[in-house]
C-alpha cells in the first residue's frame, strides 16, 4: 500500500520553523519552533487487532508503516512530534511506549496524555474535527465496529 498521499510536504522557514502541507489538498501551515504534532498510539500508530490487546498487560500492536513514515518525515525535517496516548496516564507505561517507538525506528519521542496550546495538529483514529467559525465537521477516516 502506497502512503505517498499521507506524506507531508515540508519546507524550512528559518528561523521560525517549517512550512508543512500535511495533505495535498490543504494549504501549507507554518509549524513554528515550540509547536508540536501529536499522534495517538493505539489504532493510529499501532494496530489494535493483536491478541490480548484489550487485556492486561495491554501489549502494543504492530505498527502501521504508513503512519511511521509520516512521523519520520516530520522528525527528519525538525518538526517536534509527540506520542499522545491515554497509556501515559500511568507513568509506568511511558517507558514501554518509548521502547516501542525506538524498536520501530522512531527514535526518542516524548510521550504524553496532556494537550497544551502548542499542539498544532493531532492524528487519531477516533477523532472528529470541529472547525469554528462555521459548522464544518470532519468525520474520522475509519469507523469502529461494535
Language model region names:
Residues 2-146:
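HAD-like aspartate-dependent phosphatase fold
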